[in-house]
A protein has these predicted regions:
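Active-site environment of non-heme Fe oxygenases that use a 2-His-1-carboxylate facial triad
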Residues: 1-2, 9, 14, 21-23, ...
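"Short basic amphipathic alpha-helical interaction patches in structured regions
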Residues: 27-34, 103-105
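A short alpha->loop->secondary-structure connector
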Residues: 33-44
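Structured, acidic catalytic/metal-binding patches in enzyme active sites
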Residues: 48
Length: 175
């Protein structure tokens, strides 16, 4: 309950350590990680395949393929949001190179931008074309429009994935 409270009412970030991942097989670790996550909130998939757990590892996927997710490549991830209230990361082994994770508060970014460039901050509340990355439901367009920021009861919520915004431009009818 303390972790959940800190995520919702505190800084929005909690670092936990001490799980000896070398002691367990991958399936057991995955089960423990998902069980812990379910104590914080409802598990939800992040892709059309319904995966509740994604492995951030280079599987040799082509970064230029619109269906590729950046975490399947050896490319550096840029700042982005996942479409959930909370995200969990579990490190199973240290990367040979890179692998650094950084986090930033959407509220803090919005507040800073509103102070320094209010006209740009306002534009983030306007819908922008975003690529579905070949994961659209039947009968839906391969892109959708959504604002980067939306007002919420306690600030703003964000949905931002620059690669998806850029790749939406491959569709002639996307604004």
């Amino acid at each position: 309950e303390a972790v959940r409270s800190e995520l919702i009412n505190g800084y929005g970030l909690v670092l936990l350590s001490g799980l000896d991942v070398g002691k367990y097989d991958r399936k057991s670790i995955a089960v423990m990680f998902m069980l812990f996550g379910s104590l914080i909130g409802s598990l939800r998939s992040q892709n059309a395949a319904g995966h509740l757990l994604g492995h951030v590892t280079d599987v040799g996927a082509d970064v230029d393929d619109p269906a590729t997710r950046i975490y399947q490549t050896n490319q550096r991830q840029t700042f982005h949001t996942d479409s959930t209230d909370a995200v969990g990361l579990l490190c199973l082994r240290t990367a040979k190179e890179g692998g650094v994770s950084m986090v930033v508060s959407v509220d803090a970014v919005h507040e800073r931008l509103a102070e320094e460039a209010p006209e740009l901050a306002a534009r983030l509340f306007e819908p922008i074309a975003t690529d579905r990355r070949n994961e659209q439901p039947d009968g839906e367009l391969p892109w959708f429009e959504i604002p980067v920021l939306s007002p919420s009861s306690d600030g703003v919520t964000g949905i931002y994935q620059r690669q998806y915004i850029d790749s939406a431009q491959r569709f002639e009818d996307a604004p």
